[in-house]
Amino acid sequence: MNHTVRIRVDFSAGGSIGPGKVALLEGIHRTGSLRQAAQELRMSYRRAWLLVDEINRSFLTPATTATVGGAGGGGAALTPFGEELIRRFRRLERAIQSLSREALAPITAQVRSAPPAKARSTSSAQRRRLSRTASSGRAD
């Protein structure tokens, strides 16, 4: 049975980096555009801008640079630090996934191959009736 481990690094001084922010940085690297990266991730431009701003404020060195629009349009790019941030985060993900396979093998061996059937919920009226039946000592 397989499993996936998702990580997020929270820094003591504030800020964090996780798979969503790294995917956004990868999109910027691939497209050269914050707007296009946001569209690929089905994220609003405003949300993407706020995330990139948070990333850049979290570190001494910014992860991205932007050029102002004009006749040729604006754009966004990663700094060398932004590229390093992606590489190191993805390396950490692979290492943790590998370690978790061994550490969680006894647990994942116990996971059902299909999700369990949903338990039928008991309505409040059914619970009251069951309660009265139990307290009266008779069965329906």
Predicted feature descriptions by range:
Residues I28-A38:
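Short helix-boundary/capping micro-motifs
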Residues A66-L92:
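Basic, amphipathic "hinge/linker" alpha-helix immediately C-terminal to the N-terminal HTH DNA-binding motif
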Residues M1-A13:
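Short, Lys/Arg-enriched N-terminal segment that forms or immediately precedes the first helix
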Residues E102-D140:
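C-terminal regulatory/oligomerization modules of transcriptional regulators
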Residues L51:
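Residues within the DNA-recognition helix of helix-turn-helix
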Residues R42-S44:
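Central "turn" residue of the DNA-binding helix-turn-helix
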Residues R57-P62:
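Residue cluster at the C-terminal edge of the helix-turn-helix DNA-binding motif
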Residues R88-P106:
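Alpha-helical linker/hinge and terminal dimerization helices associated
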